[in-house]
Design a protein with these regions (language model features):
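Short, charged, surface-exposed hinge/linker loops at domain edges
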Residues: 410-428
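Formylglycine-dependent sulfatase
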Residues: 1-359, 369, 382-399, 428-434
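Short beta-strand micro-motifs enriched in acidic
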Residues: 361-363
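Intrinsically disordered, low-complexity polar regions and short flexible loop motifs
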Residues: 377
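A contiguous, mid-protein "functional segment" used to position or interact
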Residues: 391-415
Length: 434
């Protein structure tokens, strides 16, 4: 499965609306989903579902979302919590309220230390709260209606050091994937600028630094795996596990040191844009693997179709149950949003087009790019963009993209919902040098 954008907000907005970015108007971290946009739970409620959110949503800029609900979110139960470490007094932070009521010392510690508070206890961890609250929603649901439950974990996510220490015991470092080496200085200039902005302290880091980051990432995943079992158990206790559609996915990936890069952004390597997608359909008894190209916007139509709805009003969103498949996957980056808040003269625009065999990454600001023949070069080490023999393939992929983008531009006329800033951030000064 490929994310529509390699950063949180636009990617999640695509998943929740069944549209790509020009359709809903959310392009970067601080954009606000227009108030006339209806999300998936809105339509599921029309199908007779009880709808619930526990945890992260992030379809609009955080400063907006922790203070105001989108009128079209469609949730009957709205236990939003953006992340574990900030906005502890915000109107919409169900995790902070739970901490204050049950673990006031931990609430005060997080209030004082923020993201610097490392290695939270398993008892007070964000993933623990999400799972426990989700299990409560399942057990206390309106049994006269079917339930749609959206579970939003924060992990795995930087700063990679808030996992419970005991979860390290679940790890087997000998099975960590080997780091894919690369020369960042040989990459397109726009990608270098992006990398220097997003991860200046760790750019090119190897050895102990990389092992520490990977340990934190995998420990967070392992602890999350344990917590998800609480939700499965609640479904089984209620006798509805077999009849439940379960989807596990993510809004973006993390480079974790591969190709010398960390974090996220306009980095279209598989580690950053190819996200997990695990699906259990109702009464499914046997597993299988699929090589079909799937996009996050497809989750909208997949769920709505399973609920008995007709998702044809979202033509870009292809249900997994259907026969029609994507000819190619596309990930778009229109800046993370921080550059223009800080007064930079322009933001970075980049696009990835990926077919079954090829991947083309276009950096529009610098007219440079990357081309990888994935069947022969799955680790994306050999950039063929400047190879004259590949000029025809680049043109073919660009025409494929332009044809699709023209059709999309004709069909969409989305509003923009405004911007949500971070207090004091607009006055910050940041100089990035290569």
């Amino acid at each position: 499965c490929y994310c529509n954008a390699p950063v949180c907000t636009p990617s999640r907005a695509c998943m929740m609306t069944g549209k790509t970015m020009p359709g809903h108007g959310v392009y970067n971290l601080f954009d606000i989903l227009p108030e006339n946009e209806k999300m998936l739970p809105y339509y599921l409620r029309e199908q007779g579902y009880e709808t619930a959110l526990v945890g992260k949503l992030h379809v609009s800029g955080t400063e907006y979302e922790v203070n105001k609900r989108n009128p079209g979110d469609g949730f009957d139960i709205y236990d939003l919590a953006h992340e574990p470490s900030v906005y502890t007094k915000a109107p919409y932070n169900a995790y902070a309220r739970w901490l204050l009521e049950n673990y006031p010392d931990e609430w005060r510690a997080i209030r004082a230390q923020g993201r610097k508070r490392k290695h939270r206890s398993a008892e007070t961890h964000f993933s623990t709260w999400v799972s426990q609250r989700s299990a409560e929603v399942i057990r206390n649901r309106d049994k006269s209606k079917p339930l749609y439950l959206q579970v939003g974990y924060f992990d795995p996510h930087n700063p990679y050091d808030h996992y419970p220490l005991e979860s390290e015991q679940l790890l087997h470092p000998e099975y960590y994937p080997e780091v894919i080496p690369d020369d960042v200085s040989a990459m397109p200039e726009a990608l270098q600028l992006e990398a220097h902005y997003h991860c200046p302290a760790t750019l090119g880091a190897t050895g102990d630094t990389n092992r520490k980051i990977r340990t934190g990432y995998f420990a967070g995943v392992s602890f999350l795996d344990q917590q998800i079992e609480k939700i499965f158990q609640a479904l089984k206790d209620e006798g509805i596990f077999d009849n439940t559609l379960i989807i596990y996915t993510s809004d973006h990936g993390d480079m974790l040191g591969d190709h010398g890069l960390y974090s996220k952004g306009a980095m279209f390597y598989e580690q950053g844009v190819n996200v997990p997608l695990i699906v259990k359909f109702p009464h499914q008894t046997q597993g299988c693997r699929s090589e079909d190209l799937v996009m996050l916007e497809d989750m909208f139509s997949t769920i709505y179709t399973a609920a008995g709805g007709d998702a044809s009003f979202r033509p870009e969103s292809l249900p997994l149950q259907g026969e029609k498949k994507h000819e190619f996957a596309m990930t778009e980056y229109r800046g993370c949003g921080k550059f223009d808040l800080m007064g930079f003269p322009h933001i970075l625009h980049a696009t990835m087009i990926r077919t079954a065999e090829w991947k083309l990454n276009l950096y529009h600001d610098t007219c440079d790019g990357q081309l990888f023949h994935l069947t022969e070069d799955p680790q994306e080490k050999n950039n063929l963009y400047h190879d004259p023999a590949c000029a025809g393939k680049i043109m073919e992929l660009m025409q494929m993209y332009l044809r699709y983008d023209t059709e999309r531009d004709y069909n969409y006329n989305a509003e923009r919902g405004g911007r949500s800033g971070i207090p004091g951030f607009a006055k910050a000064i940041c100089e990035i040098k290569l």
